[in-house]
Structure formats: structure tokens, C-alpha cells
């Protein structure tokens, strides 16, 4: 293994894990293959999009030495940007809802970021960030970007985010599994993982089915009634339109409850030694549901999005 010049060179090329014990536990026929994105330097898949946004902005002359970078985050993209900015010498200001777990804010501050915490809506529940909460963070990010003439690393709109998964994550999946992929599932956050991976996987094999995963109470893409935006699956399910997602790539929809995502995340830890977050549990839960129904016997690939270390202040894992 070569010596790295800086930690951004460690982003990507994550391992692929066959979740055989989980499949046995739930009695399903087929294979669940999980890309271990929580092993990136910032402990999430968002390191990829963070680096890609900075790199493409530099190449386009949109980000120059001495300029600051600003973005909103649930914690993961912000951590990735904090790492990239630390390595490249940019000032980074991050805006985050107070509803997200504070481990993330502390980590970003440790990495040199200026952290701006934004109040939730009056009717919101701590630990359950809604689209309305995120809109408040967006307002603050826009304000700071204007005041400081900062580059806005806009994870919900910049095509660079799709490119990170289109050019790298999906190609790694294809190579690691020798093309033996039938299904891809993804819990929608900003939508870039779904959009980028689906586009590339379908280019390799148009018969690969790509499913959107959403919270059961906030399944806007499947067209279901929104009954509660305040779900526990942090990092996504915001009940909002996602410009990066090409709906023509969607082959189906799966809904997951808070309890299901939590249960599967805990089982991942105890059975597979995988310490991951809520959305990873949601992805694996969706795969299990498909293997029990329409995709029985198939090979399903997904990402394990982030580390369980980011959720120690939540009820995802039991207290001592």
C-alpha cells in the first residue's frame, strides 16, 4: 500500500461486504452486498461528494485560494467538507439543524469548521429533522454565503455530487461484484447516491432495478400521503423534491419504519460486526423486504452510509 500525501486520497475504494448472516437471520433467499462507506475518513459516503464538489469548483474557477466554503448539512457532508477544506486550506462554515445528533457538530468543529447551529421549527422534535427544519438551515446558509462571498457547496443541487457516485461508487460496485448485480436500493437524502449509482449501473446493464427507499411516514416520491415528517432516520426522508434525482431511473419504492431501520441497524452490529447508522439500517431493511417479495433470489447492492459513532446520543443503540 502506498503512502498518502493527504487524507483525501483515502476517500473511496471502500470494501464490499456480503451480509450473509443478516440474510440467514431474516430467512431470505438471495444476496445482500453492502459497500462499506462508513470506513471513509469522515465515516460516511458523503466524503465522496464533498471532495468532488471542491475539486470541480476549483477546476471551474468557482473556488479560489483564500475564499471560504459554506454548506448546510445533517452532519455527514459537512464532515467531508471539513476534511477536504482542512487538507486544501479553505475556511469552512457549516450550518446544521439543532435536531441532528451533536456528535456530528463536535466532529466538524474538531476538524476546523465554524459550526452554526440553527433552531428547529417550534413543533419539531429533537433528533427528528423535517423538511421544514432543513428549510431554516438553508436560509442561514444562503445568508452566510452572501455575507462572506463564500463558495456554496450545495449538495442538493450541484451535479458534482452525482458525478462522485456515477464515476466512482457505482464503478467500484460493478467491478467488485463482477457485474453480478440485479438490484440497487438507496435511502434518499440529497439523492446523489441514487442518481449517480443508478445511472452508471443501468449503463452497464439496463435490466438492473433501482429502488428508492423512504420513511414510511414521509414517502413523498412514492406518492403516498405524508403523515409525519418527524421520523428518526437522520440524513434523509425530507419530504421535498430533489433536483439531482432523475425519476426515470426509479423502478420502484420501498418504505421503512423507524422501528424497522433501528432493528436492522442493531442486528448489523450484533451479527455482522457492522456499526452503522439509521439510514444503513433502512437500506438493508429495504433489501430484506425485496428478497422476501418481488426480488426473491436476486443480488442486491447498497451502501452502508455512515458510522454508528455518529448516533451515540440517540436511541439507535442501547445505553449501558
Regions found by a protein language model. Name each.
Residues 1-320:
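PLP-dependent amino-acid enzyme catalytic core
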